């Protein structure tokens, strides 16, 4: 008897819907925590200055008109708008990949989309992304970033490491 005859369409749709529900939840939670953190830091910054935590990390609001970690900041609105459109297209493509990928990749793409949507929202609402996590050690100073950047980085780096590891396993 063929395994194809035992295929249960109802269970397939149920599993697929659970996958998508998990991905939507991840995207929403990351977007939510990113928004809340940015709203809190913007509100605090209007009343006070930076938040000193320790010698390694502070919260200090910086408005980023570029892409990740303040790279490629633009003065002209044309370049800013082009980058924003490209980011929107990348988000749409990542959502497509979520629907076509294996479960672990769906989760990782969802972390990237959740963070990207947080920053995309800011680009549309404020014409800049509020970055506020300021890390430094002695004279070394890292780029200022936000919660969305953390999830984008974790998702992308984990996808890269996973793909390298799996390719090495196959070879």
Give each language-model segment a name.
Residues 1-171:
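Alpha-helical transmembrane bundles and membrane-interface segments of multipass inner-membrane proteins
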